[in-house]
């Protein structure tokens, strides 16, 4: 039993090491709608995986990476706003996923539950290994391009003047966010995966004086939320992923009490 809890907690902690820093860019660039649409569009990958009887994790990754590439391509080749593009592609993916779900049996539909709501208490040793490799790879790329991502976020025009390939940097950032959400979906579910990026990062703003400190505090707040959420879900027999998000929201409210009062 303790091994199960530890693996679940470790998976959550590993996730926060990438969701924390990347969540900052979602807040700074006001991309929460992008992450939310991405999470919901993953339903297409999940439903395809169940229909074809293949591992959902890889199908979800493929689907959302396709989603991300379509966003990048349309954003730079059309005059449509990003919100419009997100709406068109997101609802197209979501509706196709719902069509597939309605065509599969009730037995197969039961397999969708974990990917819709997640379950950190079903994490295996193989999941941990995959997660470690994924997190290290994403963190390496993020650290390598950190300064350029900050510059393009603060002032893309200035970045262009300095010779920065803004399209390349933005594409890398979208790719990292897309991949991170795809990984997070396996553990905390597609319906609330984006919350693990947004809430800790928003909370960290209250305690930070630099981007690096904000990234650090975002990870710490994420770990606190994961730990608290797992303990509450086990003690009170609650759904683990929503409990973690709820605990994260409470931390956010507490951090803003002084400002509210």
Swiss-Prot record:
Q: What does this protein do?
A: Involved in the high-affinity zinc uptake transport system.
Gene that this polypeptide is encoded by = znuB
Q: Does the keyword Flavoprotein apply?
A: no
Write out the transmembrane intervals.
5-27, 48-70, 85-107, 128-150, 172-194, 215-234, 238-257
Q: Which GO terms describe its biological process?
A: response to zinc ion; transmembrane transport; zinc ion transport
Principal subcellular localisation of the protein: membrane
Q: Which residues form the signal peptide?
A: none
> Do you know which InterPro entries this protein is assigned to?
ABC_BtuC-like, ABC_TroCD
Name listed for the protein in its UniProt record: High-affinity zinc uptake system membrane protein ZnuB
Organism source for this protein? Answer: Buchnera aphidicola subsp. Baizongia pistaciae (strain Bp)
Q: How does this protein sit in the membrane?
A: Multi-pass membrane protein
Q: Does the keyword Oxidoreductase apply?
A: no
Location relative to the cell: Cell membrane
* Keywords annotated in UniProt: Cell membrane, Ion transport, Membrane, Transmembrane, Transmembrane helix, Transport, Zinc, Zinc transport
Q: Which family does it belong to?
A: Belongs to the ABC-3 integral membrane protein family.
Instruction: Enumerate the Pfam families for this protein.
Output: ABC-3 (PF00950)
The Gene Ontology CC terms held by the record are: ATP-binding cassette (ABC) transporter complex
């Amino acid at each position: 039993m303790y091994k199960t809890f530890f693996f679940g907690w470790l998976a959550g902690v590993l996730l926060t090491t990438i969701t924390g820093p990347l969540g900052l860019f979602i807040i700074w660039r006001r991309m929460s709608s992008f992450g939310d649409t991405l999470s919901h569009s993953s339903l297409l990958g999940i439903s395809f995986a169940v229909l074809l009887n293949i591992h959902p994790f890889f199908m979800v990754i493929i689907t959302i990476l396709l989603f991300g590439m379509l966003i990048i391509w349309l954003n730079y080749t059309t005059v449509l706003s990003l919100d419009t593009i997100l709406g068109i592609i997101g609802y197209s993916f979501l509706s196709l996923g719902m069509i597939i779900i309605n065509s599969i049996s009730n037995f197969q539909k039961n397999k969708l539950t974990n990917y819709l709501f997640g379950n950190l208490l079903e994490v295996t040793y193989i999941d941990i290994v995959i997660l470690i490799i994924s997190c290290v790879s994403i963190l390496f790329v993020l650290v390598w391009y950190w300064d350029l991502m900050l510059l393009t976020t603060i002032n893309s025009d200035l970045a262009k003047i300095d010779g920065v390939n803004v399209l390349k940097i933005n594409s890398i950032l979208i790719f990292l966010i897309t991949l991170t959400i795809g990984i997070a979906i396996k553990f905390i579910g597609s319906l609330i995966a984006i919350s693990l990026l947004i809430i800790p990062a928003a909370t960290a703003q209250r305690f930070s004086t630099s981007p690096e400190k904000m990234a650090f505090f975002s990870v710490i707040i994420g770990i606190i939320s994961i730990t608290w959420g797992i303990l509450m879900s086990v003690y009170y027999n609650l759904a683990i992923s929503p409990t973690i998000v709820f605990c994260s929201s409470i931390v956010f409210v507490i951090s803003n009490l002084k400002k509210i009062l």
